[in-house]
Amino acid sequence: MAPTGSSSRRKGGPASENARPADARGAAGDALLRQAKRYPDLLSDQPETAGLADNDAGLADVIYDASVRRWLTLSALIERAGERPMARLEPVVRASLLAGAAQIVLLDRVPAYAAVGESVAFVKSRGGRRASGLVNAILR
């Protein structure tokens, strides 16, 4: 099925300064990146899903909603695994870890290997190449 546009889809701000997200995890990650930059002031935001297939738009929304709803729980798990406070991590790393952890811990239909791989790819694509090993280690 070809991707279709939907006027009822929720949209956040610009996906990133460089490009629109090409997939659900990128859309969710970009919205979480905006939130991570503002934390602890979490505002109402949603992934930019225009141009994504309906199932990808839905996945982006589910990842984002689960991450924001359980932000503190996921942060505690990430801090325990990474042995460092979330506040010391770059926003792109926090966003990637939150999205990955939400998929692994809260979403039962997402394989762990896919969540880890896509989280590493997200952080690399947003300029965090050096941090990709950290994301991989914490989520595994």
Question: At which residue positions do the language-model features occur?
Answer:
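Class I Rossmann-like S-adenosyl-L-methionine
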Residues: M1-R140
